[in-house]
Amino acid sequence: ECKWYLGTCSKDGDCCKHLQCHSNYE
């Protein structure tokens, strides 16, 4: 699951591919 630790990113989003998400990736 691609989910932000302190965000509202979901696995359906492309945020997992963003470096910002990787930093807050749970």
Curated annotation (Swiss-Prot):
Alphabetical keyword list: Disulfide bond, Ion channel impairing toxin, Knottin, Secreted, Toxin
Tissues where this protein is expressed: Expressed by the venom gland.
Chief localisation class: secreted
UniProt key word Secreted: yes
Molecular functions per Gene Ontology: ion channel inhibitor activity; toxin activity
Disulfide bonds: C2-C16, C9-C21
GO cellular component, one term: extracellular region
Subcellular location: Secreted
Keyword Secreted appears in the UniProt entry: yes
InterPro entries: Huwentoxin-1
Family: Belongs to the neurotoxin 10 (Hwtx-1) family. 17 (Hntx-9) subfamily.
Domain notes: The presence of a 'disulfide through disulfide knot' structurally defines this protein as a knottin.
Function: Ion channel inhibitor.
Name used for this protein in its record: Hainantoxin F1-31.97
Protein's organism: Cyriopagopus hainanus (Chinese bird spider)
